[in-house]
Amino acid sequence: EPARLVLPEGADAAEAEAVVRAVTLTRDLVNTPADRMGPEGLENAFRSLAERFDATVRVVRGDDLLAQNYPMIHAVGRAAGEAPRLLELEWGEESHPRVAIVGKGVCFDSGGLDLKAAQFMRLMKKDMGGAANAMGLASMIMAAGLPVRLHLLVPAVENAVGAGAFRPGDILTSRKGITVEVDN
C-alpha cells in the first residue's frame, strides 16, 4: 500500500507536497551513484524539473563553454568522459524581481591530478549537493508560484584524472579576467 501523508488540521496540503517533493528530489540527486549522476544525468534531472514547471532551459556544453567565455567550468570538467556543461533555467514573469540561485554541480571530485586519498574520495558523489539543494529550492519556488523571475544556474562537471586535466600550479583565467592559481 502506498504511503499516505497525514497532515495536521488546517495544514496546506499543496505546500506540504511541494516541500516533500523538493526534499525528495534533493536527497535522490545527492544519493544517486556517480556512474548514474554525472553531468549528463544531472542535466536530465534538471530538464525534468524545468519540464514540470514549463521553465526554459539553456545548456552550454563542452568546448562551447570556451566559445561563450566559461573557461573555469570547462577547465574543471575537460578531462572527464562526459562533457562539462552549464545548465540554466529561467522561469517566471519578466516584470517580476529577478532571483538567481547557483548550485555547485561537481558530480564526482577525484581531485583531478591532485588525487584525493581513497577515504576522502568515497563520498565525492555528494560534491554536487549544492546543485541538488539549488534544484530543490527552485522546485519549491516554482511550485509555490512565487512572484519572481527565477534564474537557476548549475555548472555540471566531473573533476577527473586524465591527460586534459589541469595541473597543480596552472594559472587559469576566469570569465571576469581574474587569474586563479590551481592548488590542492
Role assignments for model-derived ranges:
Residues 1-107, 143:
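N-terminal hydrophobic/helix-forming segments and targeting peptides
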Residues 85-88, 128-130, 178-182:
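Short, surface-exposed, polar/charged, turn-prone segments marking secondary-structure boundaries
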Residues 68-72, 111-119, 161-168:
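Short acidic, glycine/serine/threonine-rich loops at helix termini
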Residues 36-40, 131, 163:
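Short alpha-helix boundary/capping motifs
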Residues 70-81, 131-145, 172-179:
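Charged, low-complexity, helix/coiled-coil-prone segments
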